From Swiss-Prot:
The modification S-methylcysteine is found at residue 23. Residues 2-40, 41-83, 88-128, 129-171 form the Beta/gamma crystallin 'Greek key' domain. SMART domains: XTALbg. InterPro entries: Beta/Gamma-Crystallin, Beta/gamma_crystallin, G_crystallin-like. One of its GO terms (molecular function) is structural constituent of eye lens. This is Gamma-crystallin C. PROSITE patterns: CRYSTALLIN_BETA_GAMMA.
Length: 174
């Protein structure tokens, strides 16, 4: 079970809303979100309702302003609790439709470019666990939640291009 608290103002001030499960529309509970406290679980937050727009991955911890979760603005309109698994495995491909296997990963990868001499991933297959793909190295830039399934092209995970900088397993560290 997870627990996350959204605050309208920075520094955990202002009106707040506590959530313990997926919520496709947070708009009735607050008008803006400038700080967040994650008490338990791993969460993916979305800029727009119904799990649309920019995505932000948060683990247990305090986020006193939206820049702490690499937010582009103070808009959080939906969230989902990500189930934690003990094993993680995914395959990266350099071409669409899972052609041109690059590698199979079971650990975090802070820099795809350094490890595989590649800055784009055109398709992938998540075999086990949930992952977050970041468009830039060292877990920066736009984020995309990857659940176990086949992603035949980068648009399938919500990206506008094939840019891939780093990958992180979804693991609740506490």
């Amino acid at each position: 079970m997870g627990k996350i608290t959204f605050y309208e103002d920075r520094g955990f001030q202002g009106r707040c809303y506590q959530c313990s499960s997926d919520c496709p529309n947070l708009q009735p509970y607050f008008s803006r979100c400038n700080s967040i406290r994650v008490d338990s679980g791993c969460w993916m937050l979305y800029e727009r309702p119904n799990y649309q727009g920019h995505q932000y991955f948060l683990r247990r911890g305090d986020y006193p302003d939206y820049q702490q979760w690499m937010g582009f603005n103070d808009s959080i309109r939906s969230c989902c609790l990500i189930s934690d698994t003990s094993s993680h495995r995914l395959r990266l491909y350099e071409r669409e439709d899972q052609k041109g296997l690059i590698a199979e990963l079971s650990e975090d990868c802070p820099c795809i470019q350094d490890r595989f001499r590649l800055s784009e991933v055109r398709s992938l297959h998540v075999l086990e666990g949930c992952w977050v793909l970041y468009e830039m190295p060292n877990y920066r830039g736009r984020q995309y939640l990857l659940r176990p399934q086949e992603y035949r092209r980068y648009q399938d995970w919500g990206a506008v291009d094939a840019k891939a900088g780093s990958l992180r397993r979804v693991v609740d560290l506490y």
